[in-house]
Amino acid sequence: MVNTNNHISDELDKNLDEMEFLKANSDFLRGTIEQSLANPITGSITQDDAKLLKFHGSYMQDDRDLRDERRKQKLEPAYSFMIRVRVPGGKATPEQWIAMDDISNQYANHTIKLTTRQAFQFHGILKRNLKQSMKNINHAVLDSIAACGDVNRNTMCNPNPYQSQVHKEINDYATRISNHLLPRTNAYHEIWLDGEKVLDSSEEKEPIYGNTYLPRKFKIGIAVPPSNDIDVYSQDIGLIAIVEQDELIGFNVTIGGGMGMTHGITETYPQLGRLIGFIPKEKVVDVCEKILTIQRDYGNRENRKNARFKYTVDRLGETWVTEELNRRLGWEIKAPRDFEFEHNGDRLGWIEGINNWNFTLFIQNGRVKDTEDYLLKTALREIAEIHTGDFRLSPNQNLVIANVSPEKKEEIQAIIDKYKLTDGKNYTGLRRNSMACVAFPTCGLAMAESERYLPSLITKIEDLLDESGLKEEEITIRMTGCPNGCARPALAEIAFIGKAPGKYNMYLGGSFKGERLNKIYKENIDENEILESLRPLLLRYSKERLDGEHFGDFVIRDGVIAKVHDGRDFHS
């Protein structure tokens, strides 16, 4: 564990995790990435460089569908790279959308993944195309700096374009926070953009992070009540916008949320952010920096499984962390203001804003691609070519075609009709509120399918909903291929976390508003057991629910599952 005032340690404790030594000796995230990229013998890079590459917004992966066959043929794995593009608040111009579409066609697997943190993600990029892909992203005035790694990740905010003035201000704050907390190293520009090299990197400084950066990843998001679409309680720092008389006055602050855990290690668990107070809006960037530096100085650097800020808050106590924050700020944060969330989903379809329109398109699991009967990618390209507003990537992996002028609305609607694009109203409430991570075949951590499987599982659950008369009922359902929690499954009313191919832990009892953790209901079950478990529950819910009662609330009231008050009780 590191606890120093200057946060840049020349001699690291020998008990620290090996990643701390790698970061400290990486020459501010350069490592030998350039040499690895230049090696023509392999499609991979060294393991150390692969770890550092995450700070540049890319993961080395391989096609797990081909692993066994390539092993039999004595070939190395089918290596490729994922790039995650930093898009603060998920706001992109039509020109940027076209550029992302071009990159996906030229260098990736002809698809774009809209992530649960409002970023673009490309898969299947070969090593020889990695640098040009990065350059093309930069030409679009975007980047992948700090989209991954032990730093602040893409800062989220509510898309909310129909409240134009408040949203613009909130999106500006998301961008300011994201830019302020970027690493200052010149490594990204040197490696990917042929920037001028720093001759003496010993003079280089990381004024916020230091040369070992953070113990683990760090996530910040801004919610705008009544919508909790960013799942504010899942964030390391959650900011809840307080709006009075259509004016943003400040933010309530939550600390120490996080979704990830490790199967079989009960010392790891998901946790909700704790509400600690209210801050005026002009102080938000400084407050985020000071909270981040508390994690920098007191986070666990010996055990990465317990290194997230949620464990720091649990170990030191939210009162101590708040007092330390006040000390670093030089002033005291105030008591939290009143607010109320109603849901954590998206408002789909056309919504009228101030002098404009906004269309929220349902995109199942955020995968933008063309199929034989649904040319989604082609349609969005056509829209981008005529659109004069912008696009907003939603935290639920949907897409807002935003700020459509009244003059353009009919033209865009014609493209929507031509390609039969859906706002989700032809789907069940369950499917509209579904979310899945990538998992197989590219994610190296996946233990089971997720994105490729959840749609077909939902189809079978929909038969149960039809039997129960619940097809229009809004129920959140999420699936991940491993317990890292990328689709924020621990907040869903129904969730599945992969244990092995075809096997999942099933969780129930999350809140429709994203304010409560769920709890394990069945362990290591297959599809038949999933359906057999859900059928009686859905039938009971249909017959015995109270007026307006959501499924997650019902299973707790009915005694099916115990309510989780704190992440530390998640496994008990």
Curated annotation (Swiss-Prot):
It catalyses: hydrogen sulfide + 3 NADP(+) + 3 H2O = sulfite + 3 NADPH + 4 H(+). Its cofactor is siroheme; [4Fe-4S] cluster. Pfam families: NIR_SIR, NIR_SIR_ferr. Keywords: 4Fe-4S, Amino-acid biosynthesis, Cysteine biosynthesis, Heme, Iron, Iron-sulfur, Metal-binding, NADP, Oxidoreductase. Belongs to the nitrite and sulfite reductase 4Fe-4S domain family. PROSITE patterns: NIR_SIR. Binds 1 siroheme per subunit. Binds 1 [4Fe-4S] cluster per subunit. SUPFAM superfamilies: Nitrite and sulphite reductase 4Fe-4S domain-like (SSF56014), Nitrite/Sulfite reductase N-terminal domain-like (SSF55124). This is Sulfite reductase [NADPH] hemoprotein beta-component. Its EC number is 1.8.1.2. PANTHER family: SULFITE REDUCTASE [NADPH] SUBUNIT BETA, SULFITE REDUCTASE [NADPH] SUBUNIT BETA-RELATED. It comes from Staphylococcus epidermidis (strain ATCC 35984 / DSM 28319 / BCRC 17069 / CCUG 31568 / BM 3577 / RP62A). Siroheme binds at residue 486. [4Fe-4S] cluster binds at residues 437, 443, 482, 486. One of its GO terms (molecular function) is NADP binding. The gene is cysI. One of its GO terms (biological process) is cysteine biosynthetic process. GO terms for cellular component: sulfite reductase complex (NADPH). It comes from the Bacteria.
